[in-house]
């Protein structure tokens, strides 16, 4: 019996250490924003596809039709649509309504960032403004549901909704099955102190019923003193001292959330090799 027991234990250990994350990984459109070779959306999308990613973000509604057509022509996926939800406007942008209809059945996550003139200060809330957000998000969620799509509120530094707890509170009150939030590493770092960061896993676990997506990048786990904090909070994947692999493992394996994972690329300098390096880092993240 002992040899059988040993073999069984070895097989269990092998299975444990060979788990592979199967979440969808996609790249934000901001990558290679000033590259002279990949100077069109279609060229960029094709490079990203050839580099092994599952999809690409569509950034905003300008040139939406052209971008979507380019993606579909390549047999690729529009993983997310990053778009504005303006609380000073009484209705949804008609272009967004049309875009969601065109995305029907494509599995795209709609990612609204929420803005409001005369935004309240960080860490504060405005119940009346929240009610406006909830009203518009319910409309957006119903529209997205008709196309089989998920909606993930996108917390963003200096916008009306900039913290994940605020986004979760709004999503909970809106009470739509396809509405939740995106955990964006760079914006989370920009809106938290060191004590809050020690509770990351606890925060993620609390957010998990509402998590529709996460976005990651390399980062330094410090309180940035730079005039441009993104110099610490948005680095190439694989750079910086923040434990990105631990975050991905906790979300995808420990919590078992099979949600899309976006790669933040804002203001990163580089060319084709940048995409290749990020792709290599993603492959490393997938294996445990």
Q: Language-model features: where?
A:
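Conserved, mostly hydrophobic/aromatic
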Residues: 48, 56, 71, 151, ...
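Histidine-acidic metal/acid-base catalytic patches
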Residues: 19-29, 39-42, 142, 164-167, ...
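Short acidic/polar active-site loop segments enriched in Thr and Asp
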Residues: 54, 77, 108-109, 212, ...
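A cross-domain feature marking catalytic cores of carbohydrate-active enzymes
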Residues: 29-32, 58-60, 80-87, 110-116, ...
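N-terminal pre-domain/capping segments
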Residues: 18-105, 176, 180, 279-288
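Acidic-and-aromatic substrate-binding clefts and catalytic sites of carbohydrate-active enzymes
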Residues: 32-40, 55-67, 84-95, 120-123, ...
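Sec-dependent N-terminal signal peptides
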Residues: 4-13
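Active-site acidic/histidine proton-transfer and metal-coordination neighborhood
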Residues: 89-181
């Amino acid at each position: 019996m002992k040899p059988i027991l040993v073999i069984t234990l070895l097989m269990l250990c092998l299975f444990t250490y060979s788990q592979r994350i199967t979440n969808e990984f996609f790249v934000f459109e901001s990558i290679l924003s000033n590259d002279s070779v990949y100077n069109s959306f279609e060229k960029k999308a094709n490079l990203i596809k050839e580099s092994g990613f599952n999809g690409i973000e569509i950034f905003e509604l300008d040139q939406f039709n052209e971008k979507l057509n380019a993606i579909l022509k390549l047999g690729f996926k529009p993983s997310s649509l990053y778009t504005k939800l303006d609380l000073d406007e009484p209705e949804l942008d008609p272009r967004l309504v049309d875009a969601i209809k065109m995305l029907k059945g494509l599995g795209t996550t709609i990612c609204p960032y929420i803005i409001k003139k005369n935004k309240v200060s960080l860490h504060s809330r405005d119940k009346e403004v929240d009610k406006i957000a909830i009203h518009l998000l319910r409309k957006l969620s119903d529209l997205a549901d008709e196309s089989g799509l998920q909606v993930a509120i996108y917390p963003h530094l200096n916008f009306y909704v900039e913290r994940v707890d605020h986004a979760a509170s709004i999503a909970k009150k809106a009470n739509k099955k396809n509405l939740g939030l995106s955990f964006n590493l760079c914006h989370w770092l920009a809106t938290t102190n060191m004590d809050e960061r020690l509770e990351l896993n606890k925060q993620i676990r609390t957010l998990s019923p509402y998590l529709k997506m996460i976005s990651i990048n390399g980062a330094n786990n410090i309180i940035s003193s730079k005039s441009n904090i993104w110099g610490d909070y948005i680095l190439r994947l694989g750079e910086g001292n923040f434990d990105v692999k631990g975050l991905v493992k906790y979300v995808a394996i420990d919590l078992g959330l099979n949600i899309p994972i976006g790669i933040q690329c804002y203001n990163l300098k580089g060319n084709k090799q940048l995409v290749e390096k990020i792709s290599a880092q993603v492959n490393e993240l997938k294996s445990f």
